[in-house]
Amino acid sequence: MSDLDEIRRRRMEQLKQQQLAAQQQQGASLEQMQQEEQARQQFENQKKNALRQILTPEARQRLANLRLTKAELVNAIEMQLIQMAQAKRLQIPVTDATLKQILRETTSNKREIHITRK
């Protein structure tokens, strides 16, 4: 019976070590996810602050409304506005009329597809 007890004890130790290793791995991946989330939030805060300085309240409201339907387009335009402001190629603050013009220029590049039925 002592051999059987010894085998059980070893197996229990192995299982405990495996469980501990799994918990450590989960903890490491959880920490990594938290760091990534924190970095993403920090980036979003920096972007929001930059846009606050670049855009007038009316222009910010227009982007917020547009975000409801075309989030990818708004993200691209926001990044474009920030880059243009950093390169000093943009007159700050950007008014609603200027933003409308930028939106027209950005969206006019897309081709329209017409389907005619016979």
From Swiss-Prot:
Pfam families (alphabetical): dsDNA_bind
Origin superkingdom: Archaea
Keywords: DNA-binding
Annotated spans, Disordered: 15-45
Spans through the membrane: none
One MF term in the entry's GO annotations: DNA binding
Biased composition (Low complexity): 15-44
SUPFAM superfamilies: Double-stranded DNA-binding domain
GO cellular component: cytosol
Sequence similarity: Belongs to the PDCD5 family.
HAMAP family noted in UniProt: dsDNA_bind (MF_00026)
Record-given protein name: DNA-binding protein Msp_0595
